[in-house]
Curated annotation (Swiss-Prot):
An essential GTPase which binds GTP, GDP and possibly (p)ppGpp with moderate affinity, with high nucleotide exchange rates and a fairly low GTP hydrolysis rate. Plays a role in control of the cell cycle, stress response, ribosome biogenesis and in those bacteria that undergo differentiation, in morphogenesis control. Monomer. GO terms for cellular component: cytoplasm. This is GTPase Obg. The lineage of its organism: Bacteria, Bacillati, Bacillota, Clostridia, Eubacteriales. Residues 159-331 form the OBG-type G domain. PROSITE patterns: G_OBG (PS51710), GTP1_OBG (PS00905), OBG (PS51883), OCT (PS51881). Belongs to the TRAFAC class OBG-HflX-like GTPase superfamily. OBG GTPase family. It is found in: Cytoplasm. It comes from Clostridium beijerinckii (strain ATCC 51743 / NCIMB 8052). GTP binds at residues 165-172, 190-194, 212-215, 282-285, 312-314.
Length: 430
């Protein structure tokens, strides 16, 4: 099964919390803090694997979560770092942010790696907070939570030449005659149901990669037929070979077919429509009147398409000439990276300290309760001792530095209101 798009959820690992611990040894009466740091969370790393040609694996697995770092321990023991999660994808995979559809990365090189989400940083243990004036801190730093993202993986096969045309015009036959690819070939429409790639290695020319996609029909840009959903696989090509059935055995006009395909191409992508084209009149072995080809060639060249060839993929007549012309043109067209405009590029927002604040109005008592919730709050409270004055000062410092007090003031908090974080509640004093 050929799968070329997939939507998945990815999350990097949380950092482990720093430990609150003190030395307690029989002959060490003044032992001091010895809480170790938490380990960092594992990252989400995408890796290009040349042996993979489809996104089929992502049809069955939709969630990828890296390992979290372990919490720190006593005796200055550091928590173990979480294992990073490596996700293997085919070459030519584009990663998009699911909500905006903006591009995060283009993985188009052999062995390429991308650290998509870095793991959360481990929190510092209380030993790191000891000073000359605070020799026994009863607080530690919470680990930072990992990032999470819904993404869309989109595979665009990497080929130099794309074969274009209506169904049953001979694209698959040409691919099978010039490469070692074995596409399904039969005398009916839509025999090709997935893209096929092959390397053209004709004597005397530099080898190049050629892609055959399901045939395009009129109305494809509006979603009719099969070909439009695979056009993305020839978006990266440098050259198009546009094949028409010159024999007319199916009752179609080859020039009208040529016009219709180019109209659909232009609707889909102007950039793709502007790509150089070699026009091939295939099935010449079935042509009963040579004048039909000459008339077709004249009309096409009047439109500005100079390279027009007569060919029979079935008998191999004219095939070498087409392939050599393709190789010659490719020499003058540089390989381009995927062009991504600033508007198309996804820029992540800082989401590590996420929280929500809601208000409960207590009219009878004359004060409001501001409830602060979120993963950040949970982790912060787990790393402080609310019964210790120094620990509380550190706690309030974190709330201030992260903008929580500023947001409370913007929401209208007043002197005497209560602020609740999980089970811990304190009175707000201006």
């Amino acid at each position: 099964m050929f799968i070329d798009t997939a939507k998945v959820f990815v999350k990097s690992g949380n950092g482990g919390n720093g430990a609150i611990s003190f030395r307690r040894e029989k002959y060490v009466p003044l032992g001091g803090p010895d809480g170790g740091d938490g380990g960092k969370g594992g990252s989400i790393i995408f890796q290009v694997e040349t042996g993979i040609t489809t996104l089929l694996d992502f049809k069955y697995k939709k969630k990828f979560i890296a390992e979290s770092g372990e919490n720190g321990g006593g005796s200055k023991c550091y928590g173990k770092d979480g294992e990073s999660l490596y996700i293997k994808v085919p070459m030519g995979t584009i990663i998009r942010e699911a909500e905006t559809n903006k591009i995060i990365a283009d993985l188009s090189h052999k062995g390429q790696e991308l650290v998509l989400l870095r793991g959360g940083k481990g929190g510092k243990g209380n030993v790191k907070f000891a000073t000359a004036t605070k020799q026994a801190p009863h607080y530690a730093e919470p680990g930072m939570p990992g990032d999470e993202l819904n993404i869309v993986l989109e595979l665009k096969l990497l080929a130099d030449v794309g074969l274009l045309g209506f169904p049953n015009v001979g694209k698959s036959t040409l691919l099978s005659m010039t490469t070692k690819a074995k596409p399904k070939i039969a005398n009916y429409h839509f025999t090709t149901l997935k893209p096929n790639l092959g390397v053209v290695a004709v004597d005397g020319i530099d080898p190049f990669v050629m892609a055959d996609i399901p045939g395009i029909i009129e109305g494809a840009a509006e979603g009719v037929g099969l070909g439009i959903q695979f056009l993305r696989h020839i978006e990266r090509t440098r050259l198009l070979i546009h094949i028409v059935d010159i024999s007319g055995v199916e009752g179609r006009d080859p020039f009208e077919d040529f016009i219709k395909i180019n109209e659909e191409l232009k609707k889909y992508s102007v950039k793709l429509w502007d790509r150089p084209q070699i026009v091939v009149a295939n099935k010449s072995d079935m042509l009963y009147d040579e004048g039909i080809f000459e008339d077709f060639k004249k009309k096409v060249q009047e439109m500005g398409f100079d390279k027009v060839f007569k060919m029979s993929a079935a008998t191999n007549e004219g095939v070498d000439a087409v392939m050599k012309e393709a190789a010659r043109i490719l020499k003058d067209i540089p390989v381009k990276e995927l062009e991504i405009s600033e508007d198309e590029m996804y820029i992540p927002e800082e989401k590590r300290f996420t929280y929500d604040i809601t208000v409960e109005h207590n009219k009878e008592e004359g004060y409001d309760v501001y409830i602060v919730e979120g993963t950040f709050v949970d982790r912060l409270l787990s790393a402080v001792n609310v019964n210790d004055a120094d620990s509380l000062r550190y706690f309030h410092k974190v709330l201030r530095n992260k903008g929580i007090f500023d947001e409370l003031r913007e929401m209208g908090v007043k002197d005497g209101d209560m602020v609740r974080l999980n089970d811990f509640e304190f009175e707000y004093i201006l």
